[in-house]
Design a protein with these regions (language model features):
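Edge beta-strand at a domain terminus
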Residues: 125, 132-150
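Well-ordered beta-strand positions
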Residues: 32, 41-43, 93, 119-120, ...
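Bacterial Sec-dependent N-terminal signal peptides
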Residues: 1-22
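Short, surface-exposed coil-to-beta transition loops
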Residues: 36-39, 87, 111-115, 129, ...
Length: 150
């Protein structure tokens, strides 16, 4: 009897982690914020999730006709880095119940980084909540998946 229980536990334990990874990986894909100005590809690196800008509605600065750069970044050493390819979502971990936490979101329009929580409301919709201090004092933006999952 002990052998059967031990074998059952050994086989059930890895399955739990495989299912959790599969559920967490639903976040992967290309997403568009509500303003339609960019598209962000969310990827998994190790056991964390990151999002980088892969498309811009206006990729070039109208004044220079050069690719838009991170001009408002508080770190002067990266102000000439192109926005396309910039990692704006960092360090998210899956916490269960279709929610990713402990990450940050960078807003290139004002050069600020905020704590962030991502909640998947359905297979093709994310509520991205950026905040300073406590989550209740933040702002939520709705992102839509571009590669629609059924």
């Amino acid at each position: 009897m002990k052998t059967i229980l031990l074998l059952s536990a050994l086989f059930a334990f890895p399955t739990f982690y495989v299912n959790q990874d599969t559920e967490a990986d639903r976040l992967l894909g290309v997403w568009e914020p509500s303003n339609g100005k960019a598209r962000v590809k969310i990827e998994k690196i190790g056991n964390k999730y990151y999002g980088k800008i892969v498309w811009l509605k206006e990729p070039n600065d109208p004044a220079t006709n050069q690719p838009k750069v991170d001009a408002k970044n508080p770190d002067a050493s990266v102000r000439n880095v192109p926005l396309k390819g910039y990692r704006m979502l960092k360090d998210f971990t899956y916490s269960g119940s279709s929610q990713w936490e402990n990450g940050t979101i960078y807003d290139p329009e004002n050069g600020s980084t905020y704590k962030c929580v991502i909640k998947m409301t359905d297979a093709n919709t994310l509520d991205i909540r950026g905040y300073i201090g406590i989550e209740a004092l933040g702002r939520t933006d709705v992102w839509k998946r571009l590669e629609v999952k059924k």
